[in-house]
Design a protein with these regions (language model features):
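H-loop (His-switch) and adjacent beta-strand-loop-beta switch element
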Residues: 200-212
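H-loop/switch region of ABC-family ATPase nucleotide-binding domains
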Residues: 187-188
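Catalytic Walker B motif of ABC-type/P-loop ATPase nucleotide-binding domains
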Residues: 152-156
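ABC ATPase nucleotide-binding domains
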Residues: 214-258
Length: 258
């Protein structure tokens, strides 16, 4: 179980998270949601120990950092680096000392199987610079899968990709959760959260709500977090988990300490 207790984080002289407490049970599929600048990615990076808490504690239960796989935002990765898909996957997953040493047979089989899972079969030798945005994101998922981690942390896994790729990769996430893995994802698209994530954590610097997604995404919680609707009924649509693809939500304001 992941336990966050009285977590406060100051980032660039701003308070990014203010006295957050929540728990994530083993095997949960959880979305972290909130407006831009709410502290979603900050919370994920604290779980990854990339950012240290100013005050408070984070415990990973029985697991160590070796049991965690992290999927970063794809926009933070240089796609022009001269490296093949299989080299990129193995370097990130196994921290190889050299991109170009020969693969073991076991490594090659794991890479090939992961690429089949994300529908990139046969693309091991392709340069990453040749991949489309959706293919690049599928490759990042493959790198995450071969780590065999028990806890998966994903930062905006569906940003800037098409709807079909999002659906395909959501199926991969659900498969991981069905295998007993704990999956925590920072999410921007509330319609996907409403459709696929049983649990959610809503933050707006402070914790607004956490628990069952249908309860967390109630209109008064979203409004308290700083969301506003283009159309008044959209909050009710999310709450009812009905026709979520038609829901339009936008943050009330922009911040910069995410």
């Amino acid at each position: 179980m992941i336990s966050v207790t009285n977590l406060t984080v100051f980032y660039r002289n701003n308070i990014a998270l203010d006295n957050i407490s929540c728990t994530i049970k083993d095997g949960d599929l959880v979305a972290i949601v909130g407006p831009n600048g709410a502290g979603k990615s900050t919370l994920l990076k604290v779980l990854m120990k990339q950012i240290a808490p100013t005050t408070g504690k984070v415990r990973l239960g029985q697991y160590s950092m070796k049991n965690i796989a992290y999927l970063p935002q794809s926009t933070h990765i240089d796609r022009n680096f001269p490296i093949t898909v299989e080299e990129f996957i193995s370097a990130g997953a196994w921290r190889r000392s050299s991109f170009w040493r020969r693969f073991t047979q076991a490594e090659y089989q794991k890479i090939s199987q992961a690429l089949v899972t994300v529908q990139l079969s046969g693309m091991e030798k392709r340069q990453i610079s040749e991949l489309s945005g959706g293919q690049f994101q599928r490759m990042l998922f493959a790198r995450m899968l071969i780590q065999d981690a028990q806890i998966l942390l994903l930062d905006e896994p569906f940003a800037a990709i098409d709807a079909q790729t999002s659906e395909d990769l959501m199926a991969v996430i659900r498969g991981c959760q069905q295998q007993g893995k704990t999956v925590v994802a920072v999410m921007h698209d509330l319609s996907l959260v409403a459709r696929y994530f049983p649990e959610a954590i809503l933050v707006a610097t402070q914790l607004i709500a956490n628990g069952n997604t249908k309860t967390v995404l109630q209109s008064h919680h979203l409004q308290q977090a700083g969301y506003q609707a283009y159309l008044t009924p959209c909050f009710d649509q999310i709450h009812a988990l009905s026709t979520p693809q038609n829901v339009a939500i936008k943050p009330q304001q922009e911040c910069h300490h995410e």
